């Protein structure tokens, strides 16, 4: 028997604008007891059918919408249609930018709530972040196999957000072969080695591709400090752009070893690159205190705010780290700074950087704005899909 959800009167406005989330406080009643991730019918308070979605009894987001079409079933064919639709955009990007690695499915922004799929050559790496995604895993895998008959599918659902959905963390092969230690992808003429099994997220930060390419114009004949370098993405583009010297700083020796390997496979001059195992906050203070200066500092830290109650602390962290970066820049130098915290909007991030400039006693000009790459699209009904923002700043 299909379970039906009825919304509180007046709580259907966002849904009518095709926002895909229904919060627990918006539900008036339910006919039946849905299981974890079960597909349910969603009605207005007066009984008008509105959508079909996945139920999550433990999450504040109690249901995520699969479809607003009453005649559309949630089956393998549904996922095939969504995959083909998403591939259309990625084909354009792959041809234009020479990509062999990209985000194929960006969750709600591609009409598949809680599902992220990154493609590295013929390896499809899935993160299933919601109860509905988990419940429909088999159909999703079948759809991937139909669309990409020679694919290898690997799961990287080792993320803490699954706990909020009542799910355990999972990793492993879903179809085909185990990924090798290194899968080489290419973007904008740069080769990048990706560790699918042990790397951050699904192996690489694909969302910064456009920012990496645009950073090249700031680095020619410059000294560059690449903070939170991971496997060297920005550092590789700095060498591509003609940097005089690049220091890649990260706390993970494994990531730094991969960064060095990436430098070698691109044929860049290793004498121009340095790989420093260090805590970035401590390193910046050391550079400030001993008078070390750079022409360009790239600041791409991990997410500082996972929830609203962490936002105040995150603001302090972003301000401190940007202040330190400004203090070690030569006059007229460039700060490329980013935030991937979705809870921090662009205006707030800009204010934080401005406040950091005051504390650093430096004048800052915002000269360029950055955001996530086009394979991480923003659906018009889902503004929460925008999370990555950044600035190029001239520091005087």
Curated annotation (Swiss-Prot):
Entry's Gene Ontology cellular component terms: cytoplasm
Occurrences of domain PUA (ranges): 2-81
Annotated localization: Cytoplasm
Enzyme category, top tier: transferase
One Pfam family per UniProt: Methyltrans_SAM
GO molecular function term, any single one: rRNA (cytosine) methyltransferase activity
PROSITE patterns hit by this protein: PUA (PS50890)
Transferase keyword on record: yes
Methyltransferase keyword on record: yes
Main localisation: cytoplasm
Source organism superkingdom: Bacteria
Family: Belongs to the methyltransferase superfamily. RlmI family.
Protein name: Ribosomal RNA large subunit methyltransferase I
Origin species: Aliivibrio salmonicida (strain LFI1238)
Protein encoded by which gene: rlmI
